[in-house]
């Protein structure tokens, strides 16, 4: 077969535009493609919801790829291991309650299984704003990451969603935008972002599940964004809480939307 360069380009452009137009409106929009966002996307899509994930970087997986200080191993607890088992990610016991997995296998498998479940991922897109109406958050305002990086003055486009998840990690970027736009109206003790505390894995992991919640109407936080918003410690390269947080936020949204 003789290959046609223009036909290759046309296939890419047409295929991408079909996806982008299809996801102008959806059930759930996820900001951030780390472990909690991917896990949430997997469970939401598997439940039959229309869900897309927007990641500003080229690669998906957040900080999971690098394990701890570039030693590409991660640790999970018993509950996190249950999720690894469900995804088919291998792990080895280290001590009672501690399980070690290969970070590259874990990250790539999370991404693959989430996509196969029906999650649509748009990488290289940054979330620069939200849509807020009387009923709460109704969508995201998007631009190419390259536009943001180059500092170009280019207006964004919008997508509509019935629920939004901030899974952007330590920076809790979507919640920051909401706080900046509306002031101290968040579902926190003083209505503002409480700020992430210093490393304490035991306390941070326990707090993470409690802090996975609806922080503003139709806006949920998961993963490290949860602890950053609610003032709990960071945890380092233990990822069980991140996986469980992703599953938990999916369960909350499924219960609300289904």
UniProtKB/Swiss-Prot annotation:
A Pfam family of the record is Thi4
Q: Catalytic activity, per the record? A: hydrogen sulfide + glycine + NAD(+) = ADP-5-ethyl-4-methylthiazole-2-carboxylate + nicotinamide + 3 H2O + H(+)
Magnesium: is it a keyword of this entry? no
- Provide the binding site for Fe cation: 155, 170
UniProt-annotated binding residues for NAD(+): 36, 55-56, 63, 127, 153-155, 224
Which residues does the record give as glycine binding sites? Answer: 234
The protein's Enzyme Commission number: 2.4.2.59
What are the alphabetically sorted keywords of the record?
A: Iron, Metal-binding, NAD, Thiamine biosynthesis, Transferase
Gene Ontology biological-process entries = thiamine biosynthetic process; thiamine diphosphate biosynthetic process; thiazole biosynthetic process
A molecular function (GO) held by this record is:
iron ion binding
What pathway annotation does it carry?
Cofactor biosynthesis; thiamine diphosphate biosynthesis
Q: Which InterPro entries does the record associate with it?
A: FAD/NAD-bd_sf, Thi4_fam, Thi4_prok
Q: Which cofactor does it need?
A: Fe(2+)
Which principal EC class is assigned to this enzyme? transferase
Task: Give the multimer and partner information.
Answer: Homooctamer; tetramer of dimers.
Which family is this protein grouped under? Belongs to the THI4 family.
What is the stated purpose of this protein? Answer: Involved in the biosynthesis of the thiazole moiety of thiamine. Catalyzes the conversion of NAD and glycine to adenosine diphosphate 5-(2-hydroxyethyl)-4-methylthiazole-2-carboxylate (ADT), an adenylated thiazole intermediate, using free sulfide as a source of sulfur.
Q: Know the name of this protein?
A: Thiamine thiazole synthase
Q: Which organism is it from?
A: Methanothermobacter thermautotrophicus (strain ATCC 29096 / DSM 1053 / JCM 10044 / NBRC 100330 / Delta H)
The organism's taxonomy opens as:
Archaea, Methanobacteriati, Methanobacteriota, Methanomada group, Methanobacteria
